[in-house]
Amino acid sequence: MSNKYSLNDDELQLFRTSITGTKKLRQDTYTHKPLRRKIGELPAKRALQEQVDASFYFSDEFQPQLDAEGPTRYVRPGASHYELKKLRRGDYSPELFLDLHGLTQLQAKQELGALLAACRREHVYCACVMHGHGKHILKQQTPLWLAQHPDVLAFHQAPKEFGGNAALLVLVALEAPSLE
């Protein structure tokens, strides 16, 4: 890139004579150490811990009792069955989507935990989990895992526009579950 204000020889000589006898300044800028840890580190650690905590509830040993007839559905005891009906009709539209295609069971558990933690953190009431068809491993396991989590109020097979029988709509409790 060319300098648009280039100096001719006379101007350059004038500049050099005007600065003769001057000394170059020593760098006097001081860089202070940060008082606190970097802000970006703490939320990443907190998010990872939330994900681990949320996936703690998912067990392959425990088999909750789910209805085998009809579409995949579940409502937590004490929660309103009307919420399940609204899920089925498509009254709720999910704000967060999770695609489990191509994940292993362990990865799927971690992602489900992260989704539920994100729902709580972002105050999202409805989310969509797309487990797909595949070999039916995640299709069978996903409802079992979701039924074990205390933050899940209900879930139902998603309407066609959100994935049909290859996805679930999940209602998440935003406040802490009551221990009655």
Curated annotation (Swiss-Prot):
Keyword field: Endonuclease, Hydrolase, Nuclease, RNA-binding, rRNA-binding
Q: Which Gene3D superfamilies match?
A: 3.30.1370.110
GO MF terms held by the record: RNA endonuclease activity; rRNA binding
Name recorded for this polypeptide: Ribosome rescue factor SmrB
Q: Which GO terms describe its biological process?
A: rescue of stalled ribosome
Domain Smr, residue spans:
98-173
Q: Which gene encodes it?
A: smrB
Q: What is its EC number?
A: 3.1.-.-
* Top-level taxon: Bacteria
Its taxonomic placement starts with: Bacteria, Pseudomonadati, Pseudomonadota, Gammaproteobacteria, Enterobacterales
* Top-tier EC class: hydrolase
User: Pfam families given for it?
Assistant: Smr (PF01713)
Give the organism the record lists. Pectobacterium carotovorum subsp. carotovorum (strain PC1)
Subunit structure, interactors included = Associates with collided ribosomes, but not with correctly translating polysomes.
Cystine pairs annotated here are none
Q: What does this protein do?
A: Acts as a ribosome collision sensor. Detects stalled/collided disomes (pairs of ribosomes where the leading ribosome is stalled and a second ribosome has collided with it) and endonucleolytically cleaves mRNA at the 5' boundary of the stalled ribosome. Stalled/collided disomes form a new interface (primarily via the 30S subunits) that binds SmrB. Cleaved mRNA becomes available for tmRNA ligation, leading to ribosomal subunit dissociation and rescue of stalled ribosomes.
Nuclease as UniProt keyword: yes
